[in-house]
Structure formats: structure tokens, C-alpha cells
């Protein structure tokens, strides 16, 4: 029996999903629901190619998380296998709370509660199905785990969420400004006092990342036609 599932991703190529907890998460109906939710909501009104889904984004973020854990480990940062699996689970589930049309729903039907809060509720529901196997992942997601850098990899200024969605949204919209060097940025990451840091030689890559993110907001996320469609 195969010990992993291989998924071919248009952005990063082959993504390996190990059998066990992570594979069970990918197959769970609540995560599979994201295969029917567009990553960019109504942005396809402007960029017809923007048909990619939250599920694809979750897989891409998982791939980058796997790369980040590998690189941090080679730099002498000790990460238990259980911690690696937990932070991978957390990034797979980080967007599970998104509803139809993505952020549009937060401003219409569901008000007063963020998709992050809904994500946490659904993670706890899945945790019951998996008999507590997500306890550590939920701790990391809620930033209640001592190794703060693990949460920062899931939700922070240089998290794997942002590194994926900029690359992915750039790919599917055709807006090349978002095509950041995610591999280079990940290689420049390190840990100091349990917090995520960047090596000095990676500063230029971070500057490019911040510029790319700003340009993507101008050209894609806050495009006047997309915003009007969502209103």
C-alpha cells in the first residue's frame, strides 16, 4: 500500500500528502468543500482565469509549509515530528471557514464573525471526528503553543498562506507582479528565541515580497470592478 498521495499542482508541481492524519484531513468532507469555493471570489469578472479554489490554495500552502519545516530543520532548529505534522495540519485547515464567494460572505450574510473564527470552530469539529488528533494543531493555530514561530508560519507577516496566495493568484490572473520568489524567501527563514526571523541576505527578497503584495492589492484584490461586483 502506498504511504503517500501525490497531487500534481500547476504552481508547485508534485505535492506529497503522507498517509495518516494529513491524508485524512485532505479527504475530510469539510476540507473537500473548499474544492467548490473560488479563491478570489468574484475577481473572475475582471480576470477570467481566476477560477482556482481555496482547496488548491490550501494544498499549496501545505507544500510551502513542508518546505519551510525542512529548511528550518537543516539549520539546526529542532522540530519534533509531531510538531511538523501539527503545523502542516494547521495550514491545511487555515481557510476551512471560508464560505461561498469567499470574503463576500463576511460582508453580507455572516457579519460579526470572521472566517478565522469559523475555521477554528470547524477544526474543533474535525478534531472530534479524528478523536483528538488535531489538539496540537489547534494549539498552534490559536497561538497557544510555546514555539511561537510555528504559529507565525501559519499566520504572520511571512506565513505560508501569503507566500502561496501571491504566487497562485498571480499565476491564475496573469498579473505577473505577484510572482514572488517563495523558495528563496523560505531558504532565508530562521528561528531566534522561538520567533521567526530572516537572514540579513534575504532582506532584498522580503522587500520584493512586500512590493509584490502591494501591487497585487492594487491590481487584483481591490480592483474597482471586483469590489463593485462584491458590493
Where are the language model's segments positioned?
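Sequence-structural signature of the catalytic-core scaffold of metal-dependent phosphohydrolases
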Residues: 1-38, 45-89, 97-231
Amino acid at each position: 500500500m502506498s504511504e503517500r498521495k501525490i497531487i500534481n499542482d500547476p504552481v508547485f508541481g508534485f505535492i506529497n500528502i503522507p498517509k495518516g492524519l494529513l491524508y485524512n484531513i485532505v479527504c475530510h468532507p469539510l476540507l473537500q468543500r473548499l474544492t467548490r469555493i473560488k479563491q478570489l471570489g468574484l475577481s473572475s469578472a475582471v480576470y477570467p482565469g481566476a477560477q482556482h479554489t481555496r482547496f488548491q490554495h490550501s494544498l499549496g500552502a501545505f507544500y510551502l509549509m513542508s518546505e519551510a519545516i525542512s529548511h528550518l530543520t537543516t539549520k539546526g532548529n529542532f522540530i519534533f515530528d509531531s510538531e511538523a505534522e501539527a503545523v502542516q495540519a494547521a495550514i491545511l485547515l487555515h481557510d476551512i471557514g471560508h464560505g461561498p464567494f469567499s470574503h463576500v460572505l463576511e460582508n453580507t450574510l455572516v457579519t460579526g464573525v470572521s472566517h478565522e473564527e469559523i475555521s477554528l470552530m470547524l477544526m474543533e469539529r474535525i478534531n472530534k471526528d479524528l478523536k483528538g488528533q488535531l489538539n496540537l494543531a489547534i494549539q498552534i493555530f490559536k497561538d497557544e503553543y510555546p514555539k511561537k514561530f510555528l504559529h507565525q508560519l501559519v499566520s504572520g507577516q511571512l506565513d505560508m498562506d501569503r507566500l502561496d496566495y501571491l504566487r497562485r493568484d498571480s499565476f491564475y490572473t496573469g498579473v505577473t507582479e505577484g510572482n514572488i520568489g517563495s523558495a528563496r524567501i523560505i531558504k532565508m527563514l530562521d528561528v531566534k528565541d522561538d520567533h521567526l526571523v530572516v537572514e540579513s541576505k534575504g532582506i532584498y527578497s522580503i522587500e520584493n515580497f512586500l512590493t509584490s503584495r502591494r501591487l497585487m492589492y492594487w491590481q487584483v484584490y481591490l480592483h474597482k470592478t471586483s469590489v463593485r461586483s462584491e458590493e
